[in-house]
Amino acid sequence: MSKVYFTRNINSESLIKIYKALGIELPGKVGIKVSTGEDGARGYLKQQLIAPLVKELNGTIIECNTAYGGSRAVTSKHIETVRKHGFYNYAEVDIMDSEGEFKIPVKNGKHLKYDLVGKNIANYDSMLNLAHGKGHAMGGFGGNIKNQSIGIASSKGKAYIHSVGQTEDVIKCWSAKYQQEEFIESMAEAAKAVSDYFEEHKKPIAYITVMNFLSVDCDCDANQSDPVMNDLGIVASLDPVANDQAFMDLVFSSREEGAKKLQERVDTRCGRHILEYGEQIGLGSTKYELIDIDK
């Protein structure tokens, strides 16, 4: 059974504390995968919260360009958005597909034959997958699995996942026909490909999800709606499925009235299917022990 650490406190000290609770040393050049947030979005993780941990790990913020236009579709505009959102104030930022991409295999994929990732991912010795937990218009919710699949894919790779393996074209991908469950499964397959790639190269990954600004919309939405429920805290694990499962369990066990809106967003998009499918393909376990570090 996987261990998931939990704190209700969301501040820079508790973020460092929960990372240390994992008992893992991220060696060498550390990539810290966050969502840099679309211009206009408000939920992305802010400097005040994450800068001390990023500095402690001497980490580089890593991200890839998007596949839907907007303020992060090309590197030059993406860099402007990153600067506007304050990431350059405390870290180096690497738009990993700015100089190209490469394919990594999806083993026994039902939908994807490969995952197309930002070329510079190869430069990192370890990774902290630092997700902002929230809803998502297409995936139902975004946590560590989405951050590792869509997030590490190049813009063409994102198109390939969004089209369930039909095209790498960033225009054509949006008119591809598929069942919703197939898209959810494609995200899990891409995340597993990244896990496999890191494991084969003996590069560890740690997973943290900050459950604040709980909007039904993702940080990739320039018109991100207001939070629908109160902040829940932070979860951390070495297992991305367990960590996302814990996030969903906290959302679905909430008795807050507004939580129903996020629950509805998740379930109308078959969002929790990514957990059972992720477990099925060996990405992680839905069974976990929750360790409350506040006690």
Task: Name each model feature, range by range.
Residues 1-56, 60-295:
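Extended, low-polarity segments enriched in aliphatic/aromatic residues
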